[in-house]
Amino acid sequence: MLREFSKWGVEASPGKAWERKRSLLRGAVGRYRGATGGDLFWAPFPSWGTMEFPEHSQQLLQSLREQRSQGFLCDCTVMVGSTQFLAHRAVLASCSPFFQLFYKERELDKRDLVCIHNEIVTAPAFGLLLDFMYAGQLTLRGDTPVEDVLAAASYLHMNDIVKVCKRRLQARALAEADSTKKEEETNSQLPSLEFLSSTSRGTQPSLASAETSGHWGKGEWKGSAAPSPTVRPPDEPPMSSGADTTQPGMEVDAPHLRAPHPPVADVSLASPSSSTETIPTNYFSSGISAVSLEPLPSLDVGPESLRVVEPKDPGGPLQGFYPPASAPTSAPAPVSAPVPSQAPAPAEAELVQVKVEAIVISDEETDVSDEQPQGPERAFPSGGAVYGAQPSQPEAFEDPGAAGLEEVGPSDHFLPTDPHLPYHLLPGAGQYHRGLVTSPLPAPASLHEPLYLSSEYEAAPGSFGVFTEDVPTCKTCGKTFSCSYTLRRHATVHTRERPYECRYCLRSYTQSGDLYRHIRKAHNEDLAKRSKPDPEVGPLLGVQPLPGSPTADRQSSSGGGPPKDFVLAPKTNI
């Protein structure tokens, strides 16, 4: 015995032996193991650690699935509409807080049947969720929408399934948005534009001007039908014209046109509708600069087929010419046809290719705005080069009353209602103080669309003016707006008017806010630091309503209202 005590380091005293035993039991050295029924013998017990069996959970779920398929030990029936599902209450309560709360609130004798609202949770969706509870995998089938699974999971408070379904729906929405964007981009690239012109006698050859640009969006338009068929040389394939939809300044070479036709000028304009129109060469004098002339063989055109209509008052300015309004269309249908004018000699007949650069209307200031033309008429020389021999229009800052847009009604026109001009070449009010060339051929109804509201849409004096329609709609592009004032501001996009001009550098802008920012940035005007609106800001910028315009009449009668038509002139000290 003493040998055993000395072996374990314990004295023969029983009291000290018990103290040693207690110290060993308090520590993690080992366990007490009695020998021969005594409490004095100790031996350390080795620790084996935790042994894991990863297959246990899978085997448990597989066993539960087999029990559910056989109906073994199933103690609950879930009713979804008329469909019954056998399950185990323990599994349902473990996977869904909905069932856990349901079984806690119900008595033991009322837990056998659970009825779920079938208008929120569908039977196929609940079947998928029940399979997930027993398998740990969610399998989405084509006959069950993801939205139904999301609704069922939300009803049963299965948050993991809700997150997965939401991510799937968001990914699908992004994919649909991308496909829709690609489809819109594809639809925006229309076929190339083709315009047919005809003469008033004999067979009518086709005029087809083509541009070799393959990557631009193109659309196909045809003019008014001619009574005679189109004639084309048998050895030459038909030629189509491409629309110039690039930014202004992009030049494209046009091939020669071999089909016989009367002398016309092919004018490519970067219009708001991104189309190419063909207008007669008689619109321009022979002294036009910056155009490429391509002589063609002389054509036999009788002078009796052409005529010129001169304005009634050659000396006075032509008030705004806007044809009467007609049914709104999505885009104007430009038509090309020979317009009557003085017939040139057959030896002088030639084709003129004219590239007119349009203004890019933007709220941002550009550094090259001084070099760009301020309108379609800036591309031609003054002194009667366009629309007759009237003198050019004076600049806006020299005479505030000589420029700007005026709103006119259907009865305020001076020429017949069938002018055959491309839509965006129709002279706006006060734009061209020159003679207008008209055509004996009828023009389509889309050419009579006014850019601004006509008189029948104007409201009483003192108001902004409202539409007789339910929603204010642009007659040119079909866009709708919340109020008529916003529509009037939008109209400058189509007219390409820049009525606000800087009195320092003479740059023009579409909106008054753009001019204000330009002066504050470029000319160090400390206008932005004023805490309150300054009534002198308007006179400082030289913004005055056009005398005699409906805007001036409304402001004079009502004493207020946002401005609509302006002519920007420098401030004068009186």
Curated annotation (Swiss-Prot):
Ranges for region Disordered: 175-277, 305-346, 364-403, 526-574
UniProt keywords, alphabetically: DNA-binding, Isopeptide bond, Metal-binding, Nucleus, Phosphoprotein, Repeat, Transcription, Transcription regulation, Ubl conjugation, Zinc, Zinc-finger
Effect of H424L: In a breast cancer sample; somatic mutation
An annotated Gene Ontology molecular function: zinc ion binding
Post-translational modification Phosphoserine, affected residues: S362, S549
Domain BTB: 74-142
Top-level lineage group: Eukaryota
Gene name, Swiss-Prot/TrEMBL: ZBTB3
Basic and acidic residues biased stretches: 526-535
Disulfide bonds: none
Record-given protein name: Zinc finger and BTB domain-containing protein 3
Taxonomic source organism: Homo sapiens (Human)
Gene3D superfamilies: Classic Zinc Finger (3.30.160.60), Potassium Channel Kv1.1, Chain A (3.30.710.10)
The UniProt record lists the keyword Phosphoprotein: yes
Functional summary from the UniProt entry: May be involved in transcriptional regulation.
Listed Polar residues bias regions: 187-212
Chain positions of all zinc fingers (C2H2-type): 472-494, 500-523
Subcellular location per the Swiss-Prot or TrEMBL entry: Nucleus
GO cellular component, one term: nucleus
PANTHER family with a match to the protein in the record: AGAP004733-PA, ZINC FINGER AND BTB DOMAIN-CONTAINING PROTEIN 44 ISOFORM X1
Main location: nucleus
Feature: compositional bias, Low complexity: 323-334
